[in-house]
Amino acid sequence: MPAPGVHHPNTASPFLKTVAAGKGQVAAAPEHPAPSARARGSHLRPRRCSCSSWLDKECVYFCHLDIIWVNTPGQTAPYGLGNPPRRRRRSLPKRCECSSGGDPACATFCHRRPWAEAVVVPGSRSPADVFQAGRTWTSAGELLRQLRNISAAKIRFPRRPQEAGRQLRPTHPRRRKR
């Protein structure tokens, strides 16, 4: 019997014999092909578009179809989202990009201007006509002039019929204290 730690050249473990026997052979193909690294690492979720910002909750809710929204004390948190590569997220100039070019609802949502960018000007046209015409005020002077016109129009008209007939009280009391 050999001393402990010393191996006899003719004795090898069954594992080493198996590895040595299969060294020059090609392994048989398994019945089911191995899943790709991408399929193993992540769950592909159905989505109609990719948002350029995860902070845009309306976009995330619209684009990602299988998100579970959970109400938390400070905010509504989407669960089921992974972190997309930051480079792709920053490179998108629009609100989102549609997965399918044939989805008109997605195209309308992703490529429309936000309501905050639209400036409605009082005049003969309705606000809907002004918005659809795509008019924006590019110069600060033009915007300031329009805001002054709105302010002047509000001053000319009384706010409510009741307020127009009511007299205002003086700010000081009528009787003097002795």
Curated annotation (Swiss-Prot):
Residue ranges, annotated region (Disordered): 156-178
Domain of life, per lineage: Eukaryota
Residue ranges of the propeptide: 25-46, 70-178
PROSITE patterns the UniProt entry points to: ENDOTHELIN
Alphabetical keyword list: Cleavage on pair of basic residues, Disulfide bond, Secreted, Signal, Vasoactive, Vasoconstrictor
Family label: Belongs to the endothelin/sarafotoxin family.
Gene responsible for this protein: EDN2
Biological function: Endothelins are endothelium-derived vasoconstrictor peptides.
Keyword Plastid in annotation: no
Main location: secreted
PANTHER family documented for this protein: ENDOTHELIN, ENDOTHELIN-2
Record protein name field: Endothelin-2
